Amino acid sequence: MNYTASNTSLWSLVIQAGLIAAFLLLANVLRRKVPFFKRSLMPTAVLAGFLFLILRTAGLFIFKAETLEKLPYNPFDTTILEMMTYHGIAIGFIALSLRVTKKDESAKGALTAPKSGALIVSTYLVQGLAGLVISLLLYYLFFRADSPVFAASGILLPMGYGQGPGQANNIGNSFEALGLNGGRSFGLAIAAAGYLCACIVGVIYINVLARRKKRERAAHEELSGSVVTVGDFQDENEIPIAESLDKFSVQFALVLLVYLITFLVSWGIDSLITGLAPGVAKTVSPLLWGFNFIIGTLMAMLTRKVLGVFRKTKAMTRQYQNNYLLSRISGLAFDLMIVCGIASINIEDLSGLWVPFALMAVAGGAVTFVWLRWLSKKIYPNYAEEAFVSMYGMMTGTISSGVMLLREIDPNFTTPAANNLLTGSAFAIVFGAPMLVLVGLAPQSLVKTWITLGLLVAYLALLLVFLLAVRKKKAAQEEPAADGNRE
């Protein structure tokens, strides 16, 4: 085997990974030492992605053009960045879904988790409506000469804001294949704008709360990392830390095994649909592979259930999953996904799309703010501010953005707001299933884009009835008790 620099297949990924690591470490130093970045609450991975993007786009790297020409490989290969973004979201969700869950007796009979899931999906729908209204208006007014797929490009707003760079990359890529020039970069740019929105709007809102004395911002000393205890690291009767196979190796092997199963299941479904209905396969296939993280999540949950059955029947005497290490794997995967997703944006691809991008970015932040502000007061009356801040951070960035904003006003997580993000996301997979169909329907034709708009409104109305009717029923049951207490 050729081990020299001329072997691009051997060294390209290593060079790219080294650059990503360098930007992550640089961003971490800036985040800790520079007051501006410290106060911004911008996640380190987001800052690293923007640094990578700015330097790559502006051509400010140390290498001269003639030096780059002499290299046998491109050290700034966007293809590898796209690949890592695609795999990162799937691996991250698989690792999260493999974690052993514990029954919460206090949550029995409560509807907070399903209502949180419905709130998350309803926000997707509101973002989708705002995006489609903008893209349809722009199409009829200015973009008639473009592909009709442009009219459906607004559906990328919830993919970028609500879902993050992983889904924005996957669905944007499928839109690009259908005729939307620069669709992948457009989706990723919206996701990047979502992070900025979470940081800027979120921090401003927290400062307003502090000035009005409604909440106090936590001191940065309170937000420092805590000590990890043995109880945090492992559960009872887990496999040893170091045996013939290292404990981390077991976790990584489980994740990769589930991802292999995910590939085989996706390939099997794709082959079956292609054999039975080739016409349908042209539409379904890109969506199937684009939403591979959902199939991965389902396969991981099934694997977790099978391992649980093995333990109950004593076929397996020890617990193989370690929640702490699986969380670290998912954290790494999501950090890589965020850095690579932002860094792989091709600014040139956005030429001609700056107006819709700007309108959707502003509209997305505004409608998400108003929608979540209204419903947080109704669904979480006892901790509305904490719930709103965390949900807004997640629905414009990722769950880490929501947690970082929440820690500024609830550093010890004394409210259930942080837990709602996790339990709500699980229910959002169920509530969000129709959304996947609509994402695939919208770009097929102009008529189907309008149908999608109508279906978004109808589904939003159903979720709103669920969210508010349940609350009204509960309030009606508690009202007599409250009257009795006053007597």
Roles of regions detected by a PLM:
Residues 36-39, 100-114, 139-151, 173-185, ...:
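Juxtamembrane helix-boundary/capping and inter-helix hinge elements in multi-pass membrane proteins
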Residues 121-122, 134, 145-182, 205, ...:
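Alpha-helical membrane segments and immediately flanking helix-loop junctions
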Residues 34-41, 67-81, 99-119, 308-326, ...:
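Interfacial helix-loop-helix linkers and transmembrane-helix boundary segments
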Residues 102-134, 190, 250, 255, ...:
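Entry/N-cap segments of selected transmembrane alpha helices
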Residues 23, 50-55, 77-110, 298-309, ...:
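Hydrophobic transmembrane alpha-helices of secondary-active transporters
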Residues 336-348, 357, 361-471:
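C-terminal transmembrane helix pair
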Residues 258-379:
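Transmembrane helical segments that form the transport core of multi-pass membrane transport proteins
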Residues 1-10, 210-249, 274-283, 308-321, ...:
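Intrinsically disordered, low-complexity non-transmembrane regions of multi-pass membrane transporters
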